[in-house]
């Protein structure tokens, strides 16, 4: 196998980085549209008189924060020189598990396992923010 010349490798890297950036830009725009739709849905649920709408409102709020966190992750990617900070993924994981507990809380054992997963993610977040591992 022949090795590629340095300019050719940099050209391929630039092309792939551009494709990745365009893809993330499109994903960010799609998430903004979904965030707008979720805002309208939350407004509808807020004024619904049913008791079940309260659970739907809480679930909708957590989904709203998930959209918001993904958009913030994409913004941070562009601001930090095309790098995804690990702690943002941990935040998203914690929020997603909280949503899962809210939606599916029938089995106490499952809730306990989900809570242990949140504890593990919080410990991970603490380690990521420690002085030894902090990069930003």
Swiss-Prot record:
This is Protein PsiE. One of its GO terms (biological process) is cellular response to phosphate starvation. HAMAP family: PsiE (MF_01048). Belongs to the PsiE family. It comes from the Bacteria. PANTHER family: PROTEIN PSIE (PTHR37819:SF1). The lineage of its organism: Bacteria, Pseudomonadati, Pseudomonadota, Gammaproteobacteria, Enterobacterales. Keywords: Cell inner membrane, Cell membrane, Membrane, Transmembrane, Transmembrane helix.
């Amino acid at each position: 196998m022949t090795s590629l010349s340095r300019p050719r490798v940099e050209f391929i890297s630039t092309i792939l980085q551009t494709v990745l950036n365009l893809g993330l830009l499109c994903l960010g725009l799609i998430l903004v549209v979904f965030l707008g739709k979720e805002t309208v849905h939350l407004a509808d649920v807020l004024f619904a008189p049913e008791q079940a709408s309260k659970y739907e409102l809480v679930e909708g709020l957590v989904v709203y924060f998930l959209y918001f966190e993904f958009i913030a992750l994409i913004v941070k990617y562009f601001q930090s020189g095309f790098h995804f900070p690990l702690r943002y993924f941990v935040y998203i994981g914690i929020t997603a598990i909280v949503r899962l507990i809210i939606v599916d809380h029938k089995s106490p054992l499952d809730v306990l396992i989900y809570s242990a997963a949140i504890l593990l993610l919080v410990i991970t977040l603490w380690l990521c923010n420690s002085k030894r591992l902090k990069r930003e």
